[in-house]
Regions:
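Bacterial N-terminal signal peptides that target proteins for export
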Residues: 1-8
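Bacterial N-terminal signal peptides
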Residues: 8-17
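Boundary at the C-terminal end of the N-terminal hydrophobic targeting segment
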Residues: 22-24
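C-terminal auxiliary extensions adjacent to catalytic cores
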Residues: 26-70, 74-82, 114-116, 120, ...
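Glycine-rich loop at the start of a catalytic domain that most often binds anionic cofactors/ligands
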Residues: 97-114
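Contiguous domain-boundary segments centered on the initiation and propagation of an alpha-helix
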Residues: 137-200
């Protein structure tokens, strides 16, 4: 009891530590637990974990030598292309509706031309003019509340610079801003998904000392933050801001969040599997549907994998032993039923499909963040003989002959900024998630019915009939009302964002992707799923306790036992009724924070032994501290309007 009192006291202190006057637009800085680590970005093999370590945990960054060489080579290709009169969108030609407007002719580094281009670039970064032609976009509020979202955007942008022509000074400053934790104030709307131009513009503005930023969580002007950290804004020179920056067209604001989504989705799916296995142990379920015979007859790879995973989690548990009825030894079924409800039997099919959708989502994300998405696309070392279409008169018009400091290559207009493959996979995953976790509420309700549990319970605590109450757990059951509400929201989030076709830029930009809305909905859906799983945890562990009361020698298997014992560190089996009101206050947030702060991977590899109680408490309470802020930020992003009437950005 003393252990629970201490844990709850820490929770109360952490929560009241939030300033009472904190505004709805409060800022959520990261906790830089990996600030002593440095990640090298190559542009070719960025991982989800690297994005998370940089964005969420404050890891520092650098780029590889090959990354720098590629970026410099692409810049040389563009400069030589202009000298050879190759039409280059956004450089010697305008952008957007001005795509046929000639900006300059000849050598871009000729003094008068260079002065013009540097001024245009500088004005574009300062948001006082145009960036490559066409409209300028500054976005639409509210501000992004989470530092991790902005850092994820910046990290993905930096990784992609391998495929664009960039001055080294620009690359170096972006690295330094990440390493010093300078996060520009970014507006969350004003992008249509065909290039997150408004959000990119906020980062570029900070690089020339314009606008506001957060420096390690403290808000100030961009110029002050750069000065404080010993950095210099980009200057209006050829060697600083330069005459060209192939930045346009990235969806890094959306893609960075998608990386956070994929990471959090994996943790949610892992916990879903472990808690479901614990529910099976609580119900005394039949493992028959998971076995090789029915699975091999219907060879859906992810469904079969899901079944095998559950079997491995449950291996060594009493579910594989005969359940003999002491009153009828000849009945080998005993208290285990022949068939469970569909919310149990269907899990491998439903969640196997969710894992399949997750796999596709992760695959598309990794392609996206390790690819060039600018317009135009520059590719050094390509030749007309590489492919038949490249050797046709029209395409050869965009070929740069080897000369000077470049080996030549193509500069071609592209639609690589279109995020449809990633957007579709995010929506498919959200739908699969809702299809799977509709069963969480149903499973918690089946434990009230002896038609499924084969044993009767009495009283509000669900004590087993016929056993002393003082040896049973008086802990709360899942909150069915809260689960119904969260599940309803999850199902609504599964509805896709309608396809958009809005006339902008004189019709050049006439379809929109709206990736920022899709990733926001998916992230909130994952969060909702974790809340549902956390409530199922209450039911599953309560019934694991009941099964142990029935038969103290029952084994639950290594991973379920480790997770069950860890949860009992936070929520002991026996609690003082006088603390019931306080305990009920955290009926929703405490189990959620336990799952958030203690990844299922901590237990899935567990062989045996007691959990590290101090570590479990610390991680749970740290997650609880941020739970409300996180929920508020995710909900705000997911509930923003989309479509007609919203602000859209110029096609890059």
């Amino acid at each position: 009891m003393r252990r629970l009192s201490c844990a709850l006291f820490v929770v109360v202190v952490l929560l009241v530590g939030v300033p009472a006057g904190a505004s709805a637009q409060s800022y959520n800085p990261i906790t830089p637990t990996k600030a002593n680590e440095t990640i090298t970005l190559t542009g070719k093999n960025m991982t989800v974990q690297q994005v998370v370590d940089i964005a969420r945990h404050g890891a520092k960054v650098r780029v590889s030598a090959a990354h720098r060489q590629s970026s410099a080579a692409n810049l040389e290709l563009v400069l030589e292309g202009a000298r050879q009169e190759v039409p280059i969108y956004g450089f010697n030609r305008g952008g957007g509706a001005e795509r046929e407007v000639v900006i300059f002719e000849g050598d871009p580094l000729a003094p008068e031309t260079a002065e013009l281009l540097v001024q245009r670039r500088y004005d574009g970064f300062r948001l006082t003019g145009v960036h490559g032609g066409g409209e300028q976009h500054t976005g639409l509020g509210p501000e992004v509340a989470d530092e991790e979202v902005i850092r994820a955007q910046m990290a993905v942008t930096l990784n992609r610079m391998r495929y664009s022509g960039m001055n080294p000074a620009l690359v170096d400053l972006l690295i330094a801003m990440l390493n010093e934790r300078i996060a520009p104030v970014v507006l969350s709307r004003g992008t249509d998904g065909g290039g997150d131009l408004a959000q990119d513009a906020a980062v570029r503005a900070a690089m020339v000392g314009v606008g506001e930023v957060h420096l390690r969580g403290q808000r100030m002007s961009a110029r002050q933050a750069l000065t404080t950290t010993g950095l210099r804004p980009l200057e209006k020179t050829v060697n600083s801001i330069g005459v060209y920056a192939g930045w346009g067209g990235h969806n890094s604001y959306t893609d960075g969040q998608a990386a956070l989504l994929v990471h959090d989705a994996k943790q949610t799916l892992d916990w879903g599997d472990l808690v479901f296995a614990m529910s099976m142990l609580g119900l005394n379920s039949s493992v028959n549907p998971l076995t090789a015979v029915p699975q091999n007859i219907r060879a859906f790879p992810f469904v079969n994998w899901q079944a095998r995973r559950l079997l491995n989690i449950l291996r060594g548990s009493y579910l594989f032993e005969l359940e003999l009825d002491p009153n009828n030894p000849e009945d080998t079924h005993g208290q285990r039923l022949l068939q469970d409800p569909l919310s149990y039997r269907d899990y491998s099919q439903r969640n196997g499909s969710a894992w399949e959708a997750y796999s596709r989502l992760k695959k598309n994300l990794l392609i996206e963040i390790n690819s060039g998405s600018s317009n135009p696309i520059t590719k050094v070392g390509t030749h007309p003989t590489d492919s038949w279409e490249l050797n046709t008169p029209w395409i050869k018009r965009y070929y740069v002959e080897p000369a000077g400091n470049t080996e030549g290559g193509f500069i071609l207009g592209s639609a690589n900024f279109d995020n449809t493959p990633l957007n579709d996979s995010m929506e498919q995953f959200t739908l699969a998630l809702a299809q799977s976790y509709v069963g969480t509420l149903e499973r918690t309700q089946r434990t009230f019915d002896p038609f499924f549990t084969v044993v009767r319970t009495v009283g509000s605590y669900g004590f087993l009939e016929g056993f002393p109450e003082d040896v049973q757990c008086n802990v709360p059951h899942a909150d069915s009302f809260a689960m119904s509400d969260i599940l309803g929201e999850l199902k609504s989030l599964a509805n896709p964002v309608p396809a958009e076709g809005n006339w902008t830029e004189r019709g050049i930009q006439d379809v929109q992707g709206l990736g920022r809305a899709k990733v926001a909905k998916a992230r909130l859906a994952v969060d909702n799923a974790l809340y549902l799983i956390s409530q199922e945890l209450l039911s599953a562990t309560k019934w694991m306790d009941n099964r142990r009361v029935q038969s103290p020698n029952r084994s639950f298997g290594a991973a379920p036992t480790a997770a069950w014992q860890a949860w009992r560190v936070i929520s002991p089996c026996r609690q003082d009724p006088n603390e019931r009101e306080l305990s009920e206050t955290w009926r929703i947030n405490l189990p959620y924070s336990f799952l958030k702060g203690n990844p299922a991977s901590n237990f899935l590899g567990a062989a045996s032994g007691e959990p590290n109680a101090a570590r479990v408490r610390y991680r749970t309470h740290r997650a609880l501290k941020k739970a409300r802020q996180r929920r508020k930020a995710l909900t705000r992003l997911a509930n923003q309007p989309v479509g007609r009437g919203g602000v859209v950005s110029r096609r890059p």
